[in-house]
């Protein structure tokens, strides 16, 4: 059985190696295509359980101000502009200034890095907003932006005022706990409309 599986998968390896050279989005989309080529239908978790997606509007008790709304719009525009480079799904802004961009480290580590910079006095801007959304053309079946209680805790440690995510395109893990942590930390969590095209 093991030998037969190895012989079967061996011809697929050049494709897998090509996918690895293109970043996360290309890798995940390529894997989905390989399964589809074998007759499988690939669906996202949100296709099976749409209730895991954040709707438009506030998740907890707090809402962004008008100035914070402007930063949210700028963050979404930034993510759309950097999407073709497969940089990441998140950016942190404060008063129209980019403070951090998610890369290979992921959202939690980006927030930890931001907290360290703030503790070291490298960031003087008060507050800030984590904006998270899928990048244009991203295969959302395989890589949907996600937040949860740990994200909110990381945002609080980084001194942020809140989190804005693409409504209907972001998974919220443990929504009740996420809401409770956001309210406890006095952070807003809000689903906002995003115009990034879906693949």
Predicted feature descriptions by range:
Residues 37-40, 86-89, 94-97, 123-128, ...:
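Short coil/turn connectors at secondary-structure junctions
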Residues 153-197:
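C-terminal binding/interaction regions
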Residues 8-42, 47:
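Ser/Thr/Gly-rich flexible loops in soluble cytosolic domains mediating phosphotransfer, phosphorylation
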Residues 1-3:
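Conserved small/polar residues in nucleotide/adenosyl-binding loops
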Residues 31-47, 51-108, 112:
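Internal active-site segments that recognize and position negatively charged phosphoryl groups
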Residues 21-25, 29, 65-73, 85, ...:
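Electropositive phosphate-/nucleotide-binding environments in soluble metabolic enzymes
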Residues 21, 47-48, 104, 133-135, ...:
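Short, ordered loop/turn segments at secondary-structure junctions
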Residues 91, 95-152:
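Glycine- and Gly-Pro-enriched alpha-helical subdomains that act as flexible
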